[in-house]
Amino acid sequence: MNQTVTENHRLRDTIIIGAGLTGLTTAYYLTRKGCDIEVIEQSPCVGGQIRTYHENGFTFESGPNTGVISHPEVAELLAKLSPTCRLETAREASRQRLIWKGDRFHSLPSGLFSAITTPLFSTKDKFNILGEPFRSKGNNPDETIGELVQRRLGISYLHYAVDPFISGVYAGDPMRLVTRHALPKLYQLEQTYGSFILGGIAKSFSHRSERDRLATRKVFSTYGGLSNLTKALEQAIGIKRFSLGAISTSLMPCEQGWVVSFTDSCGIVNRIHCRKVITTAPAFALPSLLPFVPDKQMNRISNLTYAPVMQVSVGLRNTYGKEFHAFGGLIPSCEQKTVLGILFPSACFDNRSPEGGALYSYFLGGTRHPELLEKSDDEIIRLITTGLNEMLDYPAGIVPDLIRIFRHKKAIPQYESSSTDRFAAINELQKQYPGLVVAGNLKGGIGMADRIKQAVEIARER
């Protein structure tokens, strides 16, 4: 008589929870070292927030559109995955960034002459910036980005350079994000050199190793979209190492290490005994994932604000002769527009739209306007089509050939004033429970490059 299997027990050396970019990259490098690993993922597919769609000749993303090669680990990973996954860097012409002021977009200055003549910044601040190298450096470790920039550069640089940049990266408020956590390189420029300008000059003359030069800071994707990156990682790791569609996942410490429990897509309870666990889950998922951690201790880790973001992919087969040779346009919050920014993927990469067409990615919401995610699809479509006319100068009443709306209610973690205590609490927890690693974008940076770098460092230490 056949018995129905209701529980499945097995042994592993290391369990990785989460098959986003951090989890996949960690699993990839551990697998290359010969470690016996398994990746547990709630979704039925890998990739986390990264998801590429192909529809009617358009290739668009529902999550991150691009990364920046800001760490050598990015170039090294993509070189290892080639030719299964091929690096695609943005066209040189798309290096231009646009900032909205008044009734149109203006180019962000890229040289001395444009910095002097730009209408984005006030005459007062243009003169005041000459004194930036002589200003005292700050002594508040939790100074926000907004406070730092206003102190060193002036209010117009905050409004028309840094604020839109923060909207584009964090969908957040520069007056709430702590510089040393959200923009650590900017913080270190002031702390090390006493000045952004002097620090930038010193950095440009500093010796860089051959490996350091791999960090070109170029904007990148992969040919065919970023899902090709996560699929290549999945293929290299091996599908048998994944448990997808897992629910009710939790872990408990035991004498020999850890027991990871979850219910799989067939309804079978799995219990895996392992030596180490690496979690890449978001902060809000940790209370149920780590039930053995007391509430007071857990609250220090899980009280992380996430910016809600709506991304709208807009495709046009007929561009009416318009060409935007830029990465995209950002809208400062002081301009009081509904849109945070518009990326121009088809200006950056090949085959993102049919020949002669264009693809745009609109971003709305953020920490300042979370209510926009509650608007209906019809309301959003009206807003977008109006914006095509008012902001990109397309004919009034134009109907896009493609509109796809993606709502992410907890999209981007905000490294605010609670971050210092959060990072300390994570370190304390890891020391208290050897073999546990708390990773993911709740610490160490939110960009794709940060995720890859963190994963490489974790795999190196295992």
What are these language model-derived features?
Residues 2, 7, 109-113, 324-326, ...:
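Conserved flavin/dinucleotide-binding core of flavoenzymes
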Residues 9, 33, 244-360, 367-374, ...:
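Mid-domain catalytic core of redox enzymes
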Residues 12-39:
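N-terminal Rossmann-like FAD-binding beta1-loop-alpha1 element of flavoenzymes
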Residues 22, 45, 284:
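Conserved Rossmann-like nucleotide-cofactor binding loop
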Residues 31-55:
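Glycine-rich FAD pyrophosphate-binding loop
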Residues 52, 75-97, 156-160, 306, ...:
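A short alpha-helix-loop-beta-strand transition element characteristic
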Residues 56-137:
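Dinucleotide-binding Rossmann-like beta1-alpha1 core, especially the glycine-rich loop
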Residues 131-251, 257:
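Active-site/ligand-binding neighborhood in enzyme catalytic cores
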